[in-house]
């Protein structure tokens, strides 16, 4: 999406907006498609003057994409191995456009797009900031708890456990890889992702790192 009245010599910031599980770019970037989760947020960003790009990602098709994850794992890969490569190409292409300010390309993902907001900008420094919406979590509890209704053990999303992730990176550690770039968590008290206590516990570790570096305002 391009905002109106971009001057020929002007370079605008870009927001890459990422849909969630079983989603389509139209869910967030179609002016005629109002959904309760997305509220056309990509369109609203374009109205504010940002260039917006909403790519399609592979986490769609129920077990079809989950089989892709299982085929990738023995090769020491995951679904995000492919998604990260997609974003490398996206960043290269966006940076080549005359109307784009390549130093101000941001990432904003919701739900499964929020998972992408944690993992991809941590690896690709070309993203100047990241917004994780409706996903930030205490990831070990989210995957391993047999007692809480928020746990993936109680859903059909069997691709969620990622080898050795709990032993290496929880969400706070991923955010530290995004630091010192700005980072934001967006969530609702009743969004069904996790209880407030889980998110507050993990986010406190994220915020402490920014405070220690004198970056609390980011």
Where are these regions (language model features)?
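Short beta-strand-to-loop junctions in surface cap/lid or active-site-entrance loops
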Residues: 1-11
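Cap/lid segment of the alpha/beta-hydrolase catalytic domain
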Residues: 10-96, 142-146
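Alpha/beta-hydrolase-fold catalytic nucleophile elbow
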Residues: 56, 108, 133-134, 186
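Alpha/beta-hydrolase fold nucleophile elbow
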Residues: 99-111
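Glycine-rich nucleophile elbow surrounding the catalytic serine of serine-hydrolase chemistry
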Residues: 109-121
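Conserved hydrolase catalytic core segment
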Residues: 122-128
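Mobile cap/lid helix-loop segments that gate and shape the active-site cleft of serine hydrolases
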Residues: 129-174, 180, 193-203, 209-216
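Short beta-strand/loop motif that positions the catalytic acidic residue
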Residues: 178, 185-187
């Amino acid at each position: 999406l391009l905002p109106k009245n971009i001057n020929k010599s002007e370079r605008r910031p870009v927001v890459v907006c990422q849909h969630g599980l079983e989603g389509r770019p139209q869910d967030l970037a179609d002016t005629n498609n109002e959904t309760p989760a997305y509220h056309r947020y990509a369109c609203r960003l374009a109205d504010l003057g940002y260039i917006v790009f909403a790519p399609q990602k592979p986490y769609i098709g129920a077990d079809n994409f989950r089989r892709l994850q299982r085929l990738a794992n023995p090769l020491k890969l995951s679904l995000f191995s492919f998604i990260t490569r997609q974003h490398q190409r996206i960043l290269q292409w966006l940076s080549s456009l005359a109307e784009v300010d390549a130093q101000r390309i941001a990432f904003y993902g919701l739900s499964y797009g929020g998972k992408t907001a944690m993992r991809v900008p941590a690896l690709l420094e070309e993203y100047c900031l990241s917004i994780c919406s409706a996903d930030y979590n205490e990831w070990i509890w989210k995957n391993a708890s047999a007692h809480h209704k928020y746990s993936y053990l109680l859903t059909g999303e069997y691709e969620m456990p990622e080898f050795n992730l709990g032993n290496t990176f929880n969400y706070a550690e991923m955010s530290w890889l995004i630091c010192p770039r700005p980072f934001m968590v967006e969530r609702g008290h009743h969004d069904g992702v996790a209880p407030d206590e889980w998110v507050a516990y993990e986010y406190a570790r994220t915020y402490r790192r920014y405070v220690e570096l004198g970056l609390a305002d980011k």
